[in-house]
Design a protein with these regions (language model features):
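N-terminal localization/anchoring segments of enzymes in phospholipid and broader phosphate metabolism
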Residues: 1-534, 552-556, 568-712
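Glycine/threonine-rich ATP-lid/beta-loop region of ATP-binding domains
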Residues: 544-547, 551
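Hydrophobic alpha/beta core scaffold segments
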Residues: 559-563
Length: 712
């Protein structure tokens, strides 16, 4: 046991994450969630679990080989013990997914939307299906029987396969068929209903004839999950390569990493499981059976086959992000930011406002440079368009593009090439430190001198996810914040991770210490009987130093409210340890993604928004930025948002001291915070500007120059 830590109020990060994913799964079992959205929650749960095995389980497997006696500082478990616990907790989740999928499928069948088993079809339907199979599927299949002339093939990560146990003259062989990529996954049957069969079911049903010299003893749909845990900075870097070329090689390497999970659909697969376990060196605890399809991505296309009325009743009501309440349509975004600080709240506010800022800056004669950090982008990114346009217009454009953003590497590599071709200067992050911060600095010059527009956000510059994730985007013309941002980009360009800043908290140099300093300040207030309090909203909490400081503050009497969507390694309500800490989690229509850190009470509250969770990887091993909110108006807006989220008793759940979550009591004035913000954004969205407003900005806005910081 590790005697350096107190484990009485902490828990394992992997098991905490599995609890989060269970909350996602249980959204699919809620009657008040529209039927097609319940299907999507099933797919989100499945995709989350896939990535968990690729990243976390893959990493722990490697750890077990290298540091088998290492003990986790939050749970005191060794890697082997963690893997055992993960398997023990994941198996019931498969069973729960099967149960919920079957339930949702029955409800859809009542609406004549049904996944059919071929055995159930009428003779004529089977005949038509076979005709389709022979014409469209059979020509693109590549069946293999493993033998001396056909060695065991590489099975790609997360690609469905048909595995078969074949018998010929008492000799047992193994056959495998990969699902073709370019064939529709759902094949709809003729008729008025929306009955369909899945591609893998068709191949499974008709594939016996592909092995006519054999007797098929067993056959099943299966899927291999491979580790994606590969650190580009740990691999051999050839001096003749640029970093982009190096990353392309890394992506290819990932495809061939060690299998960490085998999934098999159905029940008849005893010999298949035994054979693959030996060939792939996968232990029994890493093999999972499922009654639900192993890949649920097809569910997103189901709504294409239903009527407008069915879509209306079966999906969330379509929502178009509103224009932000603080902006007047038709008036220069730049001029409005020069007048006062602005805050966008996604997905309720539109990201178009920020894109318009880039568009204006790309054309503005006063713009000298645009500097931006990019972690993830949409597949079709207008942000890139305007950065390229700025460079082509003679502006200096510096893009710090993080090529190591997991599973977005190829997209970022492609965009880095486009940006370079347009004349942008592109940097590829920092060695050993991912650049995860969200900072954009626009430097301008007029007759009065240099001035800045700075944007700092909690989420990515991704126009797609900005409609699905809750995030904050802060925009200011503060000279002091702009100067800090300018120092930040200078430090990044010169590989200086230990720079000093007057206002921003920047990891790895000052973020962790800055947060701890503010926790300690609230602790000192409590000890001297002054009003105090801490609110933290984040995706995950794993940083052991932060956890221990929160425990100390709790013991001193500081009321602490933690709103943590995912991993939470602190257990609240432990007497003498965390009894003044309350932890809640909101899981709903939108993915909670904003990070807000508030210290103090009332008008004296100090508020930061950040790209960083309180995870050691963020506070010590990444480049992150937290920005202070000084404007009293914006502070009050964020404090109101915090109060609404605290009142949420529909989507919020409470973490108990034993690590389990429970629902909150219902009231007469029930609160769903996401719906509240959605309706509020619609209600407060600005109308077209009046002639009076337009004249005001024409006269006043043109004279805006350098702007001093509005302090608390």
């Amino acid at each position: 046991m590790n005697k350096n830590y107190d484990f009485s109020y902490t828990q394992d990060r992997e098991l905490s994450w599995l609890k989060f994913n269970e909350r996602v799964l249980r959204e699919a079992d809620k009657k008040n969630v529209p039927i097609f959205e319940r299907l999507k929650f099933l797919e989100i749960f499945t995709n989350n679990l896939d990535e968990f095995f690729m990243v976390r389980v893959g990493s722990i497997h490697e750890m077990s080989l290298i540091h088998d006696n290492h003990r986790d500082i939050r749970s005191d478990l060794t890697p082997e013990e963690q893997l055992d616990e993960i398997a023990k907790h994941v198996r019931p989740l498969y069973e729960l997914r099967d149960k919920i999928f079957a339930k949702v499928s029955r409800e859809l069948a009542d609406k004549k939307i049904k996944r059919c088993q071929i055995e159930e079809l009428e003779k004529e339907e089977k005949k038509k299906l076979k005709t389709y199979y022979e014409a469209m599927i059979l020509p693109v299949l590549s069946p293999i029987v493993i033998g001396k002339q056909h060695p065991f093939p590489h099975i790609p990560n997360k690609v469905l396969q048909i595995g078969l146990i074949l018998k010929k003259k008492e000799k047992i062989s193994f056959g495998i068929i990969g699902l073709p990529k370019d064939v529709e996954r759902m094949i709809f049957l003729p008729g008025e209903g929306r009955s369909y069969v899945l591609l893998e079911d068709i191949i499974l049903y008709f594939c016996d004839e592909l092995f006519e010299n054999y007797t098929v003893e067993e056959k099943a749909v299966l899927c291999i999950t491979r580790s994606a845990d590969i650190n580009p900075d740990d691999e051999i870097y050839e001096s003749t390569d640029d970093y982009r070329t190096h990353m392309k090689k890394i992506i290819k390497m990932r495809a061939r990493l060690k299998p960490v999970r085998l999934e098999i659909e159905g029940n008849r697969h005893k010999e298949i499981k035994k054979y693959l376990s030996e060939r792939l060196n996968i232990s029994e605890q890493d093999i999972f059976k499922s009654q639900a399809p192993l890949d649920l991505k097809y569910v997103y296309k189901l709504t294409d086959k239903v009527s407008k009325e069915e879509r209306k009743n079966g999906c969330y009501r379509p929502f178009v992000p509103a224009l932000n309440r603080d902006f007047i349509p038709g008036v220069s975004v730049t001029k409005q930011i020069l007048e006062e600080d602005k805050l966008l709240s996604f997905p309720f506010d539109s990201m178009d406002t920020f894109i318009e800022l880039l568009k204006e800056s790309a054309k503005d004669k006063e713009t000298l440079s645009i500097k931006i950090t990019i972690y993830r982008l949409a597949r079709q990114a207008r942000i890139v368009k305007y950065l390229c346009e700025a460079a082509e217009n003679g502006k200096e454009v510096l893009v710090l593009m993080e090529l190591r953003a997991r599973f977005d590497e190829e997209n970022n590599i492609n965009y880095s090439e486009i940006l370079e071709e347009a004349g942008c200067k592109v940097m590829y992050g920092m060695e050993d430190y991912k650049v995860h911060s969200k900072v954009c600095l626009i430097t301008k010059k007029n007759s009065r001198g240099i001035y800045y527009i700075t944007q700092i956000g909690t989420g990515n510059y991704n126009e797609s996810t900005s409609k699905l994730y809750t995030d904050l985007s802060f925009m200011t013309a503060s000279e002091e914040i702009g100067h800090d941002a300018s120092v930040f980009f200078h430090n990044m360009a010169t590989f200086n991770l230990q720079g000093t800043y007057e206002h921003l908290l920047v990891a790895p140099s000052s973020l962790q210490d800055g947060i701890i300093k503010r926790i300690e300040r609230e602790k000192m207030k409590a000890e001297s009987f002054q009003p105090c309090g801490i609110f933290m909203k984040m995706n995950s909490l794993t940083d052991r130093k932060i956890i221990d400081e929160l425990s100390k503050a709790s013991n001193a009497g500081v009321p602490i409210f933690l709103l943590i969507r995912g991993i939470c390694c602190i257990r609240p309500g432990i007497p003498g340890k965390t009894e003044n800490i309350r932890v809640e989690s909101i899981v709903g229509r939108f993915l909670e993604h904003s990070r807000i850190y508030a210290f103090g009470v009332g008008d004296d509250t100090e508020i930061y928004i950040s790209s960083a969770d309180m995870m050691t990887r963020n506070t010590r091993r990444r480049v992150e930025v937290a920005a202070p909110i000084y404007d009293p108006r914006l502070k009050q807006r964020i404090l109101k948002m915090i109060n609404v989220m605290k009142q949420d008793n529909i989507q919020a759940q409470v973490l108990l001291s034993n690590g389990e979550y429970t629902t909150k009591k219902k009231r007469e004035d029930n609160m769903n915070s996401q719906i509240h913000f959605l309706n509020e954004a619609k209600r407060l969205a600005p109308k077209e500007k009046t002639q009076k407003q337009n004249l005001f900005y024409q006269v006043k806005g043109i004279f805006f120059g350098k702007k001093k910081l509005r302090k608390k």
